[in-house]
Regions:
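Anion-binding and metal-coordination hotspots
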Residues: 9, 56, 67, 75-88, ...
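Basic, short loop/linker segments at the boundary and entry of helix-turn-helix/winged-helix-like folds
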Residues: 26-71, 442-444
């Protein structure tokens, strides 16, 4: 049997410093290494202010790299998400060298030390890469997509509903004012308020102020609560004040809408628009969202524009103006789908020396071979030398009227053609349902733009 004596051991312990490195774990073509390489070539003083940083703070270059990696990899990352990535993602551990900045450290860095916004840094990086890499900036491919906003889908505001409800509310206000006039007339008081046609909140507030003065002069007190009987004038006062507040709410809705037809109460910048349809749950049809436009050159994202417009047509010119503001020039070619092919966009390209590479509505329909199904479409009609149309029966359309449309950015001349030979035509039932005959609206300048775009694309 082995016996062990009790004793106290005096022994020094030396802790070994294990510095874990992820140098071999991060691939050579990973985006984190690209961020490190780009930040090594730039003047970091343009982005980070080192003048008031404490000696015990995190390295400003490291924090900038972590921030750029998060936005390049995820598009957006909150400060808490950044702190979580530094604890769980080896790419962030590789840049941070196993340091774990808290979300407060990232917040202080963004608020106190970061000179430029993330968007300005994005464009500055693009300028640097344009000088370092062979990027063909003459061609900018444009496309857009819709992102759902972080807003409840039941917080909608519709312009038509707001207009209708405001009109009804104003009628109630006028009825209340008539009852107020009747009240003063019965009291033999020479006081009469006008009935306005258009809603005017200031006018209603002046009326309520006058009623308050009347009640104060006559010793009538405002009473509220259970068991209190309101006077007749107070009832009228409460009704008018409630209706005025409702009109004020509608005025706020119009300010939130701007020139749009819908918006969200919790996110006024978001517009209700059609999303991609979910064929499994039958959802995502109409929700608040944003229209995000992206321009790419040689695989590099050169420009981003976030819009509240539901369609892509109205986003093209603001998108290009932002590109010109950031880079000082415009690309020579902007290939895009048919959602961008409009008269205003083509005119903008013509004025700024941009070649027409945008498709237009009906582009694929025109490329189809003429058959018995599509022969009655205007795009498959024969054309005359001066741009007129000839119907399948061989009759030429005549000019009915010429109008000028000034609703867009550029004025355009629209020509309405009408065919007076539809009576007795054997194709009439398949060609038109109009009583006066088949009519076509077209613009000569837009037709020329379509021909040029079709030639450039093919």
């Amino acid at each position: 049997m082995i016996h062990q004596q009790d004793y106290t051991a005096y022994q020094t312990y030396a802790l070994l410093d294990f510095n874990i490195s992820f140098e071999k774990d991060v691939p050579a073509d990973d985006i984190s290494r690209a961020v490190i390489e780009v930040t090594e070539r730039i003047d970091i003083n343009k982005f980070v202010d080192f003048t008031h940083r404490n000696s015990h703070g995190y390295d400003g270059l490291m924090m900038l790299r972590l921030l750029l990696l998060a936005f390049a990899d995820n598009g957006y990352a909150s400060t808490r998400k950044l702190a979580e990535l530094c604890r769980t993602d080896i790419r962030y551990m590789f840049i941070a060298q196993n340091q774990k900045p808290s979300h407060q450290a990232f917040q202080r860095f963004i608020h106190d030390d970061l000179i430029m916004s993330v968007e300005d840094i994005f464009y500055e990086m693009n300028r640097i890469m344009e000088d370092e890499l062979p990027i063909d900036t003459d061609v900018l491919c444009i496309d857009g997509t819709k992102y759902e906003a972080n807003a409840n889908k039941n917080t909608f505001i519709w312009r038509k509903n707001t207009v209708r409800h405001r009109e009804r509310q104003w009628k109630k206000c006028n009825d209340t004012i008539k009852r107020i006039n009747k009240f003063f007339k019965e009291k033999n008081i020479n006081c009469r308020y006008s009935i306005l046609r258009e809603p005017n909140i200031d006018y209603l507030l002046r009326v309520t102020d006058k009623i308050e003065i009347y009640m104060k002069d006559n010793g009538i007190e405002f009473v509220h609560g259970k068991g209190c009987r309101k006077s007749d004038i107070q009832k009228l006062y409460d009704e008018l004040a409630k209706e005025a507040m409702k009109l004020f709410e509608y005025a706020l809705h119009f300010d939130m809408l701007g020139d749009r037809n819908s918006c969200s109460k919790t996110d006024p910048d978001a517009t209700f628009m059609h999303m991609k349809y979910d064929y499994y749950n039958h959802t995502n049809v109409f929700k608040p969202g944003y229209n995000v436009q992206v321009g790419v050159s040689d695989g590099f994202i050169r420009n981003i524009y976030v819009s509240s417009d539901c369609s892509d047509i109205q986003t093209y010119i603001p998108f290009m103006e932002k590109y010109k503001l950031m880079y000082g020039k415009l690309p020579l070619k902007t290939p895009a789908d048919a959602g961008y092919g409009s008269y205003d966009n083509y005119m903008y390209c013509r004025e700024n020396g941009i070649e027409l590479f945008m498709k237009y509505p009906g582009y694929y329909e025109e490329s189809k071979k003429t058959n018995d199904k599509n022969r009655f479409r205007a795009s498959h009609f024969e054309r005359t030398e001066d741009g007129g149309y000839i119907c399948p029966a061989g009759h030429e359309f005549e000019v009915d009227k010429v109008t000028t449309d000034t609703r867009g950015i550029y004025a355009r001349n629209n020509i309405k053609l009408i065919n007076h030979h539809c009576d007795g035509c054997p194709f009439r039932s398949r060609c038109t349902k109009s009583r006066i005959g088949r009519s076509i609206n077209y613009c000569k300048e837009l037709d020329e733009f379509h021909k040029e775009a079709r030639k450039n694309i093919t």
